[in-house]
Amino acid sequence: MKVLLIGGGAREHAIAMALKKNELVELYTLMKNKNPGIYSLSEEVSFNSETDVPAIKEFAEKIKPEIAVIGPESPLGVGAADLLEEMGIPTVGPKKLPAQIETSKEFMRNLFKKYEIDGSLKYAAFNNYGNDLETFIDEMTSLGKDVVVKPAGLTGGKGVKVVGEQLKDNEEAKIYAKEVFDKSIGGGNIIIEEKLVGVEFTLHGFVDGENITFMPAVQDHPHAYNNDEGPITGGMGSYSCPNHGLPFLSEEMLDRAEKIMEKTVNSINLEVGPYKGFLYGQFMLTADGPKIIEYNARFGDPEAMNLLPILKTDFLDVCFAIAEGKLDKMNIEFENKATVCKYVVPNGYPIDPVKNKELTVDKKAIENANAVLFYASINEENGKLYITGSRSAAVVGISEKIEEAEKIAQKAIKNFKGEVYYRSDIGTLDLIKKRIDRVKKLAK
């Protein structure tokens, strides 16, 4: 069974591992760097940019896969799924228009407005810097609300800036908004949104165009340093719980979040056609319930590393059900186990990361700790591993209890040597208690 995988990060390593649990799978991967984890699982690798559509076509024509799985968002934005579907290859990953739920923040917010989907917030879209933009920010200031400045297109998770985090106040938000237009960051258009106050969580679904099957809820940790301090990153780690909920999230709030995602899938279908793939909702649990911060048209990274290792159902079967619109015929199950994922990242990340430095990994010690190792932005050359400037590698602890899973991950994360750092507090009961206390304060 030939499977084409596009992408070379830790998320794709998790996808590759999950696919290879089925002994019939022969994996063929297109990626830009030599990720050693994916490379070792692949029959053949094409080293090309994941947005190089002619290279994707050439590789697909050569290997003739029976199904394709697209990992990152960038190939979705250039129509990789459209191409593969046109070639007659069942594909897991939305086509270019449905993928706008991630690639165009304006599309996403307008969809919520048009179809009256719950969980939206105050926002306005702008295609130039001027009085209208300044007036909108001034109105938010008069309401006592801070703002978030979001370039409308893809920025690799680096373009969004939040007042109180990267920006001092709403006046500085205006300065950054002008910079986005001047430098054409993320395509040059902008969404200005109210800043939400609450606790973040993520919810993933398998989507086949009509049906959505939910996965366990996960909490990501975007801040670089312990105690949720420092700059925002792509995610320093995450955890999930044995009951598939989260300690601060009631069943009612989880149900409301699921309904928001269900209505989103139906609305995308009505607006631009069926969405097939993985859908990842990033939510903020506020005093008014769950609000959507943004959607991603793929698995979250790090969340894929929490979710896929505890998937009991054959992942290849799930992928075919997504591509063929048959999720309603499947009973998808996850193990009732806790997971804790921790990333090692280059010193200086995410502002000014070191690059091309050697990373030594004691794989045996990680294995002895009963953790799972995932390689991320790593390049292997002549048998040595080099960090490339983004998140380097992750370990995942899996156990019956969150405390045990955290201990496994923490023991394993110490087995990397190089110019890297990590957060030691992810998955600890102290940090989880802070989340619970924060939600209690919101309720008051």
UniProtKB/Swiss-Prot annotation:
Catalytic function, reaction form? 5-phospho-beta-D-ribosylamine + glycine + ATP = N(1)-(5-phospho-beta-D-ribosyl)glycinamide + ADP + phosphate + H(+)
Q: Does the keyword Nucleotidyltransferase apply?
A: no
Amino-acid positions noted as binding Mg(2+) 2 in the UniProt annotation, renumbered to this chain: E294, N296
The residues that hold Mn(2+) 1 are Q282, E294
Q: Which InterPro entries match?
A: ATP-grasp, ATP_grasp_subdomain_1, PreATP-grasp_dom_sf, PRibGlycinamid_synth_ATP-grasp, PRibGlycinamide_synth, PRibGlycinamide_synth_C-dom, PRibGlycinamide_synth_C_sf, PRibGlycinamide_synth_CS
Q: Which residues bind ATP?
A: 140-202
Q: Which residues bind Mn(2+) 2?
A: E294, N296
Where would one find coiled-coil regions in this protein?
Answer: none
- GO process terms (BP): 'de novo' IMP biosynthetic process; purine nucleobase biosynthetic process
Q: EC no.?
A: 6.3.4.13
Q: Which PANTHER family match?
A: PHOSPHORIBOSYLAMINE--GLYCINE LIGASE, PHOSPHORIBOSYLAMINE--GLYCINE LIGASE, CHLOROPLASTIC
Instruction: Return the similarity comment.
Output: Belongs to the GARS family.
Protein's name according to its UniProt entry:
Phosphoribosylamine--glycine ligase
